[in-house]
Amino acid sequence: MNHDAILAAKAVNYTNAGTVEFIVDPKGTYYFMEMNTRIQVEHGVTEMVTGTDLIIEQIRIAMGEPLSFSQHDVTPKGHAIECRINAEIPEKNFMPSPGVVKHLHLPAGNGVRVDTALYTGYRIPSEYDSMIAKVIVHAPDRNCLLYTSPSPRDRQKS
């Protein structure tokens, strides 16, 4: 897939950050779905497994500078998973849940990354993107990753 993603970008002379998406069937055969010519919400997963800051690289390209690495330098290591934290009420058809963050305890530790602007006292408005945080966890292998991933829902406070 990596090789085909690179070929797709080269075929259209694409030189910025982007995501090539594939779908994989139960037999492991993959099919091209689309290419998004932007940084996506899930970019943190890629950053965790490659050690590359994609936002910095995108800024470098916009400034006319070359990437600070070559494709040959990119070697994925381990596995990562992203959990999105949304201010919604699942039992009410995922209705928005505005309000004030009274207590905030974010997961932390080796291989844990939290992307958020939340803080104690933050007022979540009623007109907002419901995703208020992302918890990304990286581990050497998938089993270790799933075993050590924090459970944000268990830690949530209102």
Predicted regions and their residues:
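ATP-dependent carboxylate activation and anion-phosphoryl transfer catalytic cores
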Residues: 1-149, 153
